[in-house]
Amino acid sequence: MNTFSAKPAEVVHEWFVIDATDKVLGRVASEVALRLRGKHKAIYTPHVDTGDFIVVVNAEKLRVTGTKSIDKKYYRHSGYPGGIFETNFRDMQAKHPGRALQKAVKGMLPKGPLGYAMIKKLKVYAGDTHPHAAQQPKTLDI
């Protein structure tokens, strides 16, 4: 008996929608990362993109526990000397809702071409509407 290896042509990518209202950032991110990789499927193969498309709505209503809304820092750099910028979770959610979730999920995915392809299947929206109704996404409860 040979080891099963999924072929890219035989993988079916489904669409799911997650409502992030009053959900904890890390718990949503870990479930999203698992489904983007395809590890919930029996045909999971590490070198093939077997994951599904995930649409997250109400990302502006995500929360973190404890004092992380002030203590959790996000860093970025302009590329110039002294060009480091720091922001906390509360300010990032106010200015760019959903970016914290995007960064959390990206950190949980593999680095390299396959991981970059996986993160493109994540669609995050601040409000409760999304333009992916034509794909008929299934509701996913976390």
From Swiss-Prot:
GO terms for biological process: negative regulation of translation; translation. Signal peptide: none annotated. InterPro entries: Ribosomal_uL13 (IPR005822), Ribosomal_uL13_bac-type (IPR005823), Ribosomal_uL13_sf (IPR036899). Keywords: Ribonucleoprotein, Ribosomal protein. Gene3D superfamilies: Ribosomal protein L13 (3.90.1180.10). GO terms for cellular component: cytosolic large ribosomal subunit. GO terms for molecular function: mRNA binding; structural constituent of ribosome. Pfam families: Ribosomal_L13. HAMAP family: Ribosomal_uL13. NCBIfam families: rplM_bact. This protein is one of the early assembly proteins of the 50S ribosomal subunit, although it is not seen to bind rRNA by itself. It is important during the early stages of 50S assembly. Belongs to the universal ribosomal protein uL13 family. Part of the 50S ribosomal subunit. This is Large ribosomal subunit protein uL13. It comes from Leptothrix cholodnii (strain ATCC 51168 / LMG 8142 / SP-6).
